[in-house]
């Protein structure tokens, strides 16, 4: 867990720890506000001329596209803090793809969210580069409502991930999930020519994205969670991933907790 104060390792480390602790505190405040707003049917979003850069890109694409083929890894319940769901509900005929969620209770909610959209297929699996099964560490389902909407979205392969939210381990349980690789997922559902890829896996985004052959798969848009302020992805991992993406022709738009990689053609479509 992040600690405040100075240590013998030097002021740079102490400053980083302080920034991480402050960011985590602000994140928890936002989660509390989100909880209150969620009960009233509202959602809190950072305002950047009304939309995030990612949303702006997709809104422009929707105006000219007849079909956006997509894969969303870590879809959760389909609606909570989801950048894609509002766009699909607004223009359902223009999206075709997979929403992937390994946790059983979240998957049932995900199926319900997309029940009226035949072109969106919910998949009850996790994406992992090597393993057929993994344990996901998550908040106890009976406590999620009490803790607030933020608690729905912190399930992770990482057994220490919950500490970023200052939770006690007594609030956590593990759930065994079935895994598949990215390529096997696409093959199983006959998905090719992906235009949009979204990952939100609470700490495994780097491993998934770095393992994708971007010479073979060329999503025009890749939206992912880096979580640098709280350590979901290390700075070295982030730099390596950005280098890999830029070497394959992608531009990068960096936001506080997420990033969007996009091919130059995204601005011409």
Predicted region positions:
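Phosphate/nucleotide-binding beta-alpha loop and adjacent structural elements of enzyme active sites
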Residues: 2-269
């Amino acid at each position: 867990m992040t600690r405040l104060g100075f240590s013998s390792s030097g002021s740079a480390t102490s400053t980083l720890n302080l920034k991480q602790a402050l960011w985590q505190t602000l994140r928890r405040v936002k989660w509390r506000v989100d909880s209150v707003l969620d009960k009233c049917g509202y959602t809190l979003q950072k305002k950047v001329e009304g939309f995030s850069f990612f949303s702006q890109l997709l809104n422009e694409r929707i105006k000219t596209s007849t079909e956006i083929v997509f894969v969303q890894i870590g879809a959760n319940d389909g609606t909570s803090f989801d950048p894609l769901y509002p766009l699909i509900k607004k223009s359902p005929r223009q999206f075709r793809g997979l929403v992937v969620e390994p946790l059983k209770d979240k998957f049932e909610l995900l199926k319900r969210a997309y029940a009226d959209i035949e072109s969106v297929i919910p998949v009850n699996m996790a994406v992992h580069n090597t393993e057929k099964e993994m344990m996901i560490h998550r908040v106890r389902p009976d406590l999620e409502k009490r803790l607030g909407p933020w608690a729905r979205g912190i399930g992770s392969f990482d057994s220490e991930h919950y500490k970023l939210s200052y939770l006690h381990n007594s609030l956590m349980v593990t759930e065994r999930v079935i895994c598949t690789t990215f390529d096997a997922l696409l093959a199983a559902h006959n998905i090719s020519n992906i235009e949009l890829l979204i990952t939100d896996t609470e700490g495994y985004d780097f491993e998934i994205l770095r393992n994708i052959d971007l010479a073979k798969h060329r999503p025009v848009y890749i939206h992912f969670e880096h979580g640098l302020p709280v350590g979901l992805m290390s700075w070295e991992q982030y730099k390596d991933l950005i280098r890999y993406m830029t070497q394959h022709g992608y531009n990068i738009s960096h936001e506080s907790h997420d990033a969007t990689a996009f091919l130059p053609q995204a601005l011409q479509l």
